[in-house]
Amino acid sequence: MDEADWNFTEQQAETVFTCEQLRDTQGVKPHSEIVLDLFFLPIEGEEARREAFEKALSSFGYELGEAEKDEEVAASIGPIPFTPQDIWLHEERTTKMALARGFRPDGWGFAEPDN
């Protein structure tokens, strides 16, 4: 799978929807400072180049984290403002890195902001 096969428009719409839901139902304030956690899984049937993916993430300032599943890659960045635009910037960038190395996004999250 490469960028041409991925639906970035749908992914961005889901990010905007999720941010709106978190704002409206959980009271997360726009522009709250968050540390964004991003999760990735290998693409079935493709060679997942984990070391290359982790190196790419690190070179862009993402901290590698503990993943819940052995095959999963977890990365964090922040603090960043809680806005759909800021989250999407990182989600799109890391998705492109992932797809080029045999991984796909598997969601994002963050710890509840202090304010």
Model feature map: region roles:
Residues 1-115:
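Long, contiguous binding/interaction regions
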